[in-house]
């Protein structure tokens, strides 16, 4: 049975005070909660502080990051490597987010190379896929998702998805307040799983597929009730301890 994962992407938000307060608040809210893995991806500058805060609290919260480079060292100004992330305890690394694809011109092929390098370094890629509003309106949702997935599958084999996480995030629902219905999200998740199953039913059966896009405490239960939605990649609601914990609790309850 797939184990649900709820991950908070803090994006470009935070301060030293906020990191400590939010993580301590999460630890308190999640006390006694089992059956769900909870992860956070703070901005790179705060990963060290987040690790120290979680370690001091004896927390089970998983530490992640929002990006990684294709190199472990060298003349690559402004980048951070998988080796550096590992040294600070970050294990779950978001790649392929639509904001990286759009604002940093990251192609499917480039994201696939990041995926391979993270796996090579023993880290867990959280591979974001999803379509724009125009692509959604044109009925191209699954074609886009398949293309983004196949950039990994066709270069590394479907087995590369073992132990990784896929996050389906329709771009038109990220930070907009608009969200795909639970039924629509389930339909796409099922199609994503079926696409993977064309190469390996075993990998498809076991891979965790999160939904992302304006997930809130008010709609989380409906998403997690769907059989192919295995958690969430959460943006805005992850910046509030009570809201994020409520989403994690909904996942634990639905998948028990």
Curated annotation (Swiss-Prot):
**InterPro entries in UniProt:** Aldolase_TIM (IPR013785), TIM_sf (IPR035990), TrioseP_Isoase_bac/euk (IPR022896), Triosephosphate_isomerase (IPR000652), Triosephosphate_isomerase_AS (IPR020861)
- The record's disulfide annotation reads none
GO biological process entries: gluconeogenesis; glyceraldehyde-3-phosphate biosynthetic process; glycerol catabolic process; glycolytic process
Keywords on record = Cytoplasm, Gluconeogenesis, Glycolysis, Isomerase
Q: What is its EC number?
A: 5.3.1.1
Q: Which residues form the active site?
A: 97 (electrophile), 169 (proton acceptor)
First-listed, main subcellular location of the protein, grouped into a coarse class: cytoplasm
User: What GO terms are given for molecular function?
Assistant: triose-phosphate isomerase activity
Tell me what reaction this enzyme catalyses.
D-glyceraldehyde 3-phosphate = dihydroxyacetone phosphate
User: Which pathway does the protein contribute to?
Assistant: Carbohydrate biosynthesis; gluconeogenesis; Carbohydrate degradation; glycolysis; D-glyceraldehyde 3-phosphate from glycerone phosphate: step 1/1
List the protein's name.
Triosephosphate isomerase
